[in-house]
Amino acid sequence: MSTPASAAPAALVRVPAGTTAGTAVREAGYPSKGPDVVVVVRDAEGQLKDLSWVPDTDVEVEPVAANTDDGRSVIRHSAAHVLAQAVQQEFPEAKLGIGPPIKDGFYYDFAVDRPFTPEDLASLEKRMKKIIKGSQRFSRRVVESLEDARAELAKEPFKLELIDDKSGIDDPEIMEVGGNELTIYDNLDPRTGEKVWGDLCRGPHIPTTKHIPAFKLTRSSAAYWRGNQDNADLQRIYGTAWESAEAQDQHLELLAEAERRDHRKLGSELDLFSFPDELGSGLPVFHPRGGIIRTEMEDYSRKRHVEEGYEFVNTPHITKGHLYEVSGHLDWYRDGMFPAMHIDEELNEDGTVRKPGQDYYLKPMNCPMHNLIFRSRGRSYRELPLRLFEFGSVYRYEKSGVVHGLTRVRGMTQDDAHIYCTREQMRDELATTLQFVLGLLKDYGLDDFYLELSTKNPDKFVGDDAVWEEATATLAEVAESSGLNLVPDPGGAAFYGPKISVQVQDALGRTWQMSTIQLDFNLPERFDLEYTANDGTKQRPVMIHRALFGSIERFFGVLTEHYAGAFPAWLAPVQVVGIPVAETFADHLFDVVKRLKAAGVRAEVDASDDRMQKKIFNNTAQKVPFMLLAGARDVEAGAVSFRFRDGTQVNGVPVDDAVRIVTEWIGRRENASPTAELLQPGKEG
């Protein structure tokens, strides 16, 4: 299952001076309706223009169809205008915030007297459909002066603020202003040409509201004006819009499946983890069943790291603030850290300070502490590459509005390692690390990757430009040699060095950032790290930061959604459950389970008072990969019957064969769910 595909770029069309772009597109034979109808054009400078645009000179433009990313974005922006018109018709007191297109949809913010209800959304959808059916025309109008704009929008305080801040706004979600002109888009009655409604907007827009063939309002929520909690409280309505009903249905099906797979929902249903209010936002606890999965993940990771030559270390959760002054985190990452704890201060009886205290911080990253381990004694080139690894707990102050389940938390455990090597070893270490990353992800059934190269943020970095350029070029070379698609991420690097991140697609086609590999020449300098080279000179090591899971919590959440809670048998908290047809046959299954447990399998017998069919239903809902049933014939034959997650069943399997099948399947770390097919001759091993 994936999102609808986008059409390929169209051939260029010549637009004569004095002719509308829409006329030229029609005369070139492009479709006038359907999902590939042209909704805007792109000029030679890459700017999107309305079809009503009339160039002063002959130009060539690229038609942009509705079923492209840009086409959908324009449709969604226009749908946001239709939503705003509907809201102001139903709630005349509503004041307009902003209404941009976003990934797969749009939203609009409003100042209203109360939150929107589901009934409000249903009523607004009906009004929007009426507006769309009326085929209102979007008409761009340049406002001659700031004074004229202020006068026209005098009753819209948020729009007035945008007008006043016009020159200082750099936010892609603010569509109201931009460029050298102030423009308003009027919605015109197609019969009379009279203005029905209008909004401050830089555009572009579709020709008419009838170019919105499919839309749906999805939800509402609270919001802050311009995302700042110190600003006015607003109400936000989200929606989605597409080039066809079929594309929208496909998207809504994807959303419904994503909701069914939501790891927060499954975490509760499968008793894996929870988020107690008593602990605070972004601080999960893992229950016994979730703890089993987490332990399996960590144990397998340790095994693989030993095979790759890593050495295990452990560091504390808090440190004196000076450490993060040296590393630069307090200068460049303070907003992502929890506030300082001022401790160890001693006072005299009169309240004066006898012994000054010190600021301690929860660690946001492990790298400074690993540097102290490297620096704890002299190092020789013979020790390099030195690969230090730990499951390090770190704490980051994420704003409450962005905390989300396990995928965005405030306390997390990283499978974190730092590699110290010579410059001569650097490229091979990077290449080896990248292959290690990809191999480990494949071991968990994630094998659809691309790479992202995050480069220097010119406003937030330490070190020399030349050093950054060398590090970036080296990472790019290693990434390109992997054969994977490489996507640039300008300005996305941490302050101390560029990074490669592995982007993974899950079963629904969604992209998740997983592993990161960062090259760092700067922290070794700041910590004065040295090793003795083979010629006796002191040299700086190169430092490579890498986390393969990213964090245990995030990886756990992604895996939960990827497998919809039906974890591979080797990860499943309960791998086998015995279900007797009647209580009389339970002892037979207890004997089988005893053998499985002795072989290291997590097995149990469902000894509840429920009837057999209810037990099958319950354990299927708990997504147990192997259910072993036993009735009179099974007991008599020394056999069991297999039942699988998909409902398939194989009867009368001898117990010795059943134990072998289960243990071999788990031992091979198969990621697919077992089915009846695996018991066919030649399939089970």
UniProtKB/Swiss-Prot annotation:
Where does the signal sequence lie?
none
Whom does it interact with, and what assembly results? Homodimer.
What functional role does this protein have?
Answer: Catalyzes the attachment of threonine to tRNA(Thr) in a two-step reaction: L-threonine is first activated by ATP to form Thr-AMP and then transferred to the acceptor end of tRNA(Thr). Also edits incorrectly charged L-seryl-tRNA(Thr).
Keywords recorded for this protein, A-Z: Aminoacyl-tRNA synthetase, ATP-binding, Cytoplasm, Ligase, Metal-binding, Nucleotide-binding, Protein biosynthesis, RNA-binding, tRNA-binding, Zinc
Which GO molecular-function terms appear in the entry? Answer: ATP binding; metal ion binding; threonine-tRNA ligase activity; tRNA binding
Subcellular compartments: Cytoplasm
- GO cellular component terms given for this protein: cytoplasm
> Which residues are Zn(2+)-binding?
C367, H418, H545
Region annotation (Catalytic) ranges: 262-568
SUPFAM superfamilies xref list = Class II aaRS ABD-related (SSF52954), Class II aaRS and biotin synthetases (SSF55681), ThrRS/AlaRS common domain (SSF55186)
Record has Flavoprotein as a keyword: no
The organism named in the record is Rhodococcus jostii (strain RHA1)
Using the UniProt record, name the top-level EC class of this enzyme in a single word.
ligase
Q: Does the keyword Repressor apply?
A: no
Q: Where is the TGS domain?
A: 1-65
Catalytic function, reaction form? tRNA(Thr) + L-threonine + ATP = L-threonyl-tRNA(Thr) + AMP + diphosphate + H(+)
Q: Name one GO biological process term.
A: threonyl-tRNA aminoacylation
Q: What is the lineage of its organism?
A: Bacteria, Bacillati, Actinomycetota, Actinomycetes, Mycobacteriales
Cofactor field: Zn(2+)
NCBIfam families, per the entry:
thrS
Family, similarity comment: Belongs to the class-II aminoacyl-tRNA synthetase family.
PANTHER family listed in its UniProt record: THREONINE--TRNA LIGASE, CHLOROPLASTIC_MITOCHONDRIAL 2 (PTHR11451:SF44), THREONINE-TRNA LIGASE (PTHR11451)
Q: What is its EC number?
A: 6.1.1.3
Top-level taxon: Bacteria
- The entry's protein name is Threonine--tRNA ligase
Give the cofactor note text: Binds 1 zinc ion per subunit.
